[in-house]
């Protein structure tokens, strides 16, 4: 990160850089380094969520992006950072991330052929002292002791105290903090996200901006799949893509009405399209990509959705049936 300026050294237009009807100017870096994400030209930005994230970069707001799985929450933040050349680090708050991982710990190192105990900083003090956007993924799955470490830095000018070092770290002026979550801190209400926690409301209240990222409009979702799987972008592949996205929309509506306990995300549709190129059979690819993840009792409903969109029956086998129907074709 030595090659990156200590602070943003240029201003960019949101209208020119992101194509939105906005007069907002945001700070950016003119040079890139290894921590800047790669630009994905196929990514589609949600205007409201993008403006919320840009407010985080421009005005040092703490931004939490909430949405269902596969909507591209973390990627959304990364792609904004990529276009600002802002260094970015993601930390997944799984059950194995501990307070010591975030804060730091004493470690035995060799200095001049002698073993000595030395304090090694965790990711939080490391990022706080640098022009870095720190992203906490799966924020609502973090353990309580970990969450209270994060609470210290949620204040915009929040200083971080290293008790083991008797040292107070002042945030770098270009440090930014973001997080992504499937829930809004209320726990696993719909049964989809096991392992999520009910979050302390005092901590949720410290987030300056909470943005909700929903699934893309139909045409934009088709455009993303075309960009990811260009083999289906021609006139012959377009009807197939439209049927695939129509089926995904039916599963989402079925989930909303309680007919299904799972749904197809844009990520699932992309996986299905990629698997179609492998198996050369949309029905088989669909079974292997999504249907086999569904409960046995719900598979006839999904098969009906498939019949509506593709005009042909989908062979459905129970888990006890053994094997994939049509796998030998």
Annotate the PLM regions.
Residues 1-236:
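AAA+ P-loop NTPase catalytic core and its hallmark functional loops
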Residues 1-36, 43, 50, 217-222, ...:
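Alpha-helical lid/collar subdomain of P-loop NTPases
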């Amino acid at each position: 990160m030595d090659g990156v300026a200590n602070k943003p050294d240029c201003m960019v237009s949101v209208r020119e850089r992101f194509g939105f009807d906005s007069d907002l100017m945001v700070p950016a870096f003119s040079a890139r380094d290894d921590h800047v994400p790669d630009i994905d030209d196929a990514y589609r930005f949600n205007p409201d969520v993008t403006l919320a994230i840009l407010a985080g970069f421009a005005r040092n707001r703490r931004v939490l992006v909430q949405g269902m799985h596969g909507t591209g929450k973390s990627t959304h933040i990364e792609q904004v950072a990529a276009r600002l050349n802002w260094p970015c680090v993601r930390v997944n708050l799984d059950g194995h991330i501990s307070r010591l991982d975030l804060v730091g710990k004493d470690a035995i190192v060799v200095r001049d052929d002698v073993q000595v105990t030395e304090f090694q900083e965790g990711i939080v003090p490391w990022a706080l002292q640098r022009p870095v956007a720190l992203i906490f993924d799966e924020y609502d799955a973090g353990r309580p002791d970990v969450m209270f470490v994060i609470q210290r830095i949620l204040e915009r000018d929040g200083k971080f105290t290293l008790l083991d070092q008797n040292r107070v770290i002042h945030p770098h002026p270009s440090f930014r903090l973001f997080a992504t979550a499937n829930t809004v801190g209320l726990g696993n209400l719909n049964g989809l996200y096991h392992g999520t926690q009910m979050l302390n409301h005092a901590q949720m209240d410290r987030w300056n901006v909470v943005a909700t990222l929903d699934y893309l409009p139909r045409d934009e979702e088709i455009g993303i799949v075309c960009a990811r799987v260009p083999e289906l972008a021609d006139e012959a592949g377009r009807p197939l893509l439209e049927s695939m996205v129509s089926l995904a929309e039916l599963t989402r509506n079925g989930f909303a009405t309680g007919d299904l306990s799972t749904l197809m995300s844009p990520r699932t549709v992309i996986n299905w399209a990629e698997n179609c190129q492998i198996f050369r059979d949309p029905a088989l690819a669909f079974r292997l990509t999504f249907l086999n993840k569904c409960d046995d009792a719900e598979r006839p409903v999904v098969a009906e959705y498939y019949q509506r969109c593709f005009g042909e029956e989908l062979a459905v086998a129970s888990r006890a049936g053994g094997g994939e129907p049509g796998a030998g074709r």
